[in-house]
Amino acid sequence: MRVAVDAMGGDNAPGVEVEGAVAAAREFGIAITLVGDTEKVNCELAKHNCKDLDITVKHASEVVGMHDSASDAVRKKKDSSIRIAFELVKNNEADAVVSAGNSGATMAAGMFVLKRIKGIDRPAIAQIFPTLRGKTLVLDVGGNVDCKPLNLVQFAIMGEVYARSVMDVENPKIGVLSNGEEESKGNDLTRESSTLLKSTSLDYMGYVEGRDIFNGMVDVVVCDGFVGNVVLKLSEGLAEAVSTMLKEEIKQSLLYKIGYILSRRAFINFKKKVDYTEYGGAPLLGIDGVGMICHGGSNAKAIKNAIRFAHEYARKGVNQHMVEKLQENYPLYMQQLETLKAQAAG
């Protein structure tokens, strides 16, 4: 299997993309195609020992910047690195795409080139969060600002399959993010989504609150992209703030410094758990292919791990499992939806 890497996406392209790709090829034996300006990419490759590594370069003359509109990736910049990367998957020249570029453009290009898997109205961006019990998958974290109840049900099904297939969770528990655990809480979106999810074959646990994401009460949390993105950015900011405040406190006293030295291994383990680079990127679920969206400021380690997860996603045939799960549950939640419509009309 081969992973196409958008070598021109991200704040530090193509340097970190090339470095991460070389590391992934060397450590995991993954075949990689770097998509971007051939001259610039080859210049970066020359800095590394790539002997015996299966790394090729595909030229793309255009780049979709962070401030470009998502439609530019599809309509205007037809030779952009992100679009060409997805074209490689479409033409069976690659099996997955990794990009640290414009997330909206990545999602738009993936949908335009590869389309959606059967049974999905809107793809979603998912993100793994570290918890007290392991990991929790949250989706959508930015793909769809406005959602309908059916979207959240489909997100839950995709998340359940991803958690089972890629995260190795035996029986994923599902929750809807709300402002309280009581069924009376929430809004129209969460209440109707909850009713529909109860009719599915999923192990649905009901509402969960923001704090429950990190205590590991459930394995998959679904919400609309507006709320999910706020959760994501808040978590990133909190992790950075806690780290900075802790460093400042340690500097205040020699005793604190000695304590830090004695506890250094614990601090290292903690940092590893909350470090987003360990997870690489956020899978784009729902497109008829594999896409991994990385943070714009990703370093080489994040790119390397994103390539690893993208390869794993493609290797396990997760999308086919999603289609099967969607087909299994479609008549169940659609029947419940018709019941809700009849009740509203009556």
Swiss-Prot record:
Pathway terms, separated by semicolons: Lipid metabolism; phospholipid metabolism
EC numbers: 2.3.1.274
Reaction equations catalysed: a fatty acyl-[ACP] + phosphate = an acyl phosphate + holo-[ACP]
Record's keyword terms, sorted: Cytoplasm, Lipid biosynthesis, Lipid metabolism, Phospholipid biosynthesis, Phospholipid metabolism, Transferase
Main subcellular location of this protein, as a coarse class: cytoplasm
One Gene Ontology MF term: phosphate:acyl-[acyl carrier protein] acyltransferase activity
Compartment(s): Cytoplasm
InterPro entries, per the entry: FA_synthesis (IPR003664), Phospholipid_synth_PlsX-like (IPR012281)
Gene Ontology terms: cellular component: cytoplasm
Gene Ontology biological-process annotations: fatty acid biosynthetic process; phospholipid biosynthetic process
Similarity-based family: Belongs to the PlsX family.
SUBUNIT field: Homodimer. Probably interacts with PlsY.
Function: Catalyzes the reversible formation of acyl-phosphate (acyl-PO(4)) from acyl-[acyl-carrier-protein] (acyl-ACP). This enzyme utilizes acyl-ACP as fatty acyl donor, but not acyl-CoA.
The name this protein goes by in its record: Phosphate acyltransferase
Gene: plsX
